[in-house]
Swiss-Prot record:
PTM per Swiss-Prot/TrEMBL: Some glutamate residues are glycylated by TTLL8. This modification occurs exclusively on glutamate residues and results in a glycine chain on the gamma-carboxyl group.
Lineage of source species: Eukaryota, Metazoa, Chordata, Craniata, Vertebrata
Protein name (Swiss-Prot/TrEMBL): Protein SET
Alphabetical list of Gene3D superfamilies matching this protein: 1.20.5.1500, Nucleosome assembly protein (3.30.1120.90)
GO molecular function: chromatin binding; DNA binding; histone binding
């Protein structure tokens, strides 16, 4: 597996909300305040003033970083477009990429993978000012699961700083709604399989309960989208495990052969010792005669 490359898009630093500093009691005005406490109070007031300056610089830095990111986000667009055109020439690129990603693959059931075989293009678009949100678009070929050609999910940050999301309504074909996966079989084995089956990947499009903690959206935007090739090229873990097992079997066979050879050498050594003892006995008998 090739080493993971550094993401071309660094996660957008979250601008801290300005928090009003607590009002400090003016104890310096108390004439009876002990000298030590008075010095501590003055130090706290000065620390508060310095901290306000630090916060002001942090806010200024965030604004300048945002401008730089906006500039380079525009410069990257032609390359993203060119990359999408090249990816379109590779069958099953995106489903392979998702299956090879450890976090995304944990959300995929067998039917999800089948549906994602019709996924031809993925695009992540950050809004003009970046900090207000982004959109992820999934483009599909004609498929037996739903009518939509494009499924999208948007993430917004409103003026108050509260995150929200909205998405395309999936127009499922009859009996193909993967978000309502169920089985009519009531035997224990079937129920066990149902329990182990992960929730459908497509429920992500209907889940808007906590947009600020949407891990899948963040993974696609900040990890997969900057460099999907690194996950497409990840070797199949099943093949790796199979090769490792074969290597272990070969090692065990070699060790077994070595043990057999060693036992054979020991047996030959014992036979030689017996022959030597026999010859010595014959010589002793001859001397006695």
């Amino acid at each position: 597996m090739a080493p993971k490359r550094q993401s071309a898009i660094l996660p957008q630093p979250k601008k801290p909300r300005p928090v009003a500093a607590p009002k400090l009691e003016d104890k310096s005005a108390s004439p009876g305040l002990p000298k030590g406490e008075k010095e501590q109070q003055e130090a706290i007031e000065h620390i508060d003033e310095v901290q306000n300056e630090i916060d002001r610089l942090n806010e200024q830095a965030s604004e300048e970083i945002l401008k730089v990111e906006q500039k380079y986000n525009k410069l990257r667009q032609p390359f993203f477009q060119k990359r999408s055109e090249l990816i379109a020439k590779i069958p099953n690129f995106w489903v392979t990429t998702f299956v090879n990603h450890p976090q995304v693959s944990a959300l995929l059931g067998e039917e999800d993978e089948e549906a994602l075989h019709y996924l031809t293009r993925v695009e992540v678009t950050e809004f003009e000012d970046i900090k207000s949100g982004y959109r992820i678009d999934f483009y599909f070929d004609e498929n037996p699961y739903f009518e939509n050609k494009v499924l999208s999910k948007e993430f917004h940050l409103n003026e108050s700083g509260d995150p929200s999301s909205k998405s395309t309504e999936i127009k499922w074909k009859s009996g193909k709604d993967l978000t309502k996966r169920s089985s009519q079989t009531q035997n224990k084995a079937s129920r066990k399989r149902q329990h182990e089956e992960p929730e459908s990947f497509f429920t992500w499009f209907t889940d808007h309960s906590d947009a600020g903690a949407d891990e899948l959206g963040e993974v696609i935007k900040d990890d997969i989208w900057p460099n999907p090739l690194q996950y497409y090229l990840v070797p199949d873990m099943d093949d790796e495990e199979g090769e490792a097992e074969d290597d272990d079997d070969d090692d065990e066979e070699e060790e077994g052969l070595e043990d057999i050879d060693e036992e054979g050498d020991e047996d030959e050594g014992e036979e030689d010792d017996d022959e030597d003892e026999g010859e010595e006995g014959e010589e002793d008998e001859g001397e006695d005669d």
